[in-house]
């Protein structure tokens, strides 16, 4: 299980990236492939942009 810390405006959010909730995220192609290839994880100092519903999250993890 991996934790993603993302930023929306000035607020920080923590997400547990699991196989179940991963499918609920709408991401751009690069993040989709990157998360998929890395088993829903992430690399340090990677920029991420995730859209979930009407809310956009952007941050560096």
Kindly give the residue locations of the regions a language model identified.
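N-terminal acidic leader/helix
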Residues: 1-26
């Amino acid at each position: 299980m991996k934790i993603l810390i993302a930023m929306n405006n000035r607020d920080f959010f923590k997400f547990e990236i699991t196989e179940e909730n991963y499918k609920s995220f709408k991401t751009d192609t690069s993040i989709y492939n990157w998360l998929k290839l890395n088993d829903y994880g992430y690399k340090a100092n990677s920029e991420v942009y995730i859209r979930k519903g009407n809310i956009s999250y952007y941050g560096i993890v």
